[in-house]
Regions:
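Structured alpha-helical
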Residues: 1-103
Length: 103
């Protein structure tokens, strides 16, 4: 496993993340790629992307039931990436995403 690359100094999570399995698409540099989200919160996500996603990439993440969400990759190690949404999800949006994940 490679070394974690971080866009900024690590700080503890302020929001709990829920475990999910959502196969979807992430787009960066105008290139859509497959990604499997493995956890999700109102502020961000962690996923596995076979192609990898460069640190600090501006991304659009297609969340079933919500459509595309804009954000930025905050850390990356191998195929795993973590990102933060530009605009946090509200409770109703997070509930919709969770319902889609377990439908």
């Amino acid at each position: 496993m490679g070394q974690v690359q971080r866009a900024e100094v690590f700080t503890p999570r302020a929001v709990e993340r829920a475990d999910v399995v959502i196969d979807t698409q992430i787009t960066f540099a105008h290139r859509p790629r497959s990604i499997t989200l493995v956890n999700l919160s109102s502020h961000g996500f962690m996923g596995e992307c076979p192609a990898g996603v460069p640190l600090r990439s501006r991304i659009s993440l297609d969340i079933p039931g919500l459509g595309p969400l804009e954000g930025c990759v905050r850390w990356a190690v191998g195929r795993r990436v973590g990102g933060r949404f530009d605009t946090p999800l509200n409770d109703a949006q997070l509930a919709e995403a969770m319902a889609a994940a377990f439908a």
